[in-house]
Amino acid sequence: KNSYSNYMLLPQKMEDALFAGDPPYDGLDAIFISHYHGDHFTPEDVLRFMNARPDVDMYVPSQAAIALRAIASAADQDIFDRVKSVDLEYKDAPISLVVENLEIEALRIPHSGWPTGRLDVANIVWRVTLDEATTVIHLGDADANDIHFSTDPEFWNSKQPDMAFPPYWFYSSQVGLNILSRRIGAQQSVGIHVPAAMSNDPSLRPAELRDVDLFTVPGETRAISGH
């Protein structure tokens, strides 16, 4: 719940519905956390959510799991049966696991600011396939530098995602655009982590962001073509 004076916070009505399991959140099976930063992961709220929603699993970097355990009481310990953590260093090989109808792949890509800033933050890229049919990739706050993506072409070439969710700054440089088209190769993409000041009107955005799809309103969705 830290906006860092730049990002939108979750509206209270939406938070209440999420915690209560009201539509459209009643069919939620799993949540994925990219990294432990205040605008992505608040341990106190996540602990409360996991207790409120015993039907939901959570996949997190180990840094987030450690923070969650640090505030959990004895009465909270049952939730950790549903908390699946990954411990990856930069340049580690991707890991994968299959849980029921989900194939889950995780890869650590540095947080934006590399190579001088936020090097201690484990930013996890999640590539998730549902029912062996629909693949979505979420990049968290990944750094838009091809050096992070060029070292493992086998991983990137093994699947074409149906939808990618890159941070909006990938659209602001040719390098970022090349990563999206040549490395990730998703059929669709929508930019995330958009500053609150970004206009809903594309014509009022910076020139490089006028022709791309961005999430700018809390709760908005996109259909995945063909699914």
Model-found features: residue ranges?
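Active-site environment of divalent metal-dependent phosphoester hydrolases
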Residues: H37-F41, A65-L68, D92-I95, S112-W114, ...
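Active-site-proximal loop/helix segments of hydrolase catalytic cores
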Residues: E44, P110-R183
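Pre-active-site segment of Zn-dependent metallo-hydrolases
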Residues: K1-F32, Y36, E44-R48, D143-K159
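Binuclear metal-ion centers of metallo-dependent hydrolases, dominated by the metallo-beta-lactamase
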Residues: A72-L102, L177-H227
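Active-site neighborhood of phospho(di)ester-bond hydrolases with catalytic His/Asp-centered motifs
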Residues: K1, G27-D39, Y59-S62, I137-A142, ...
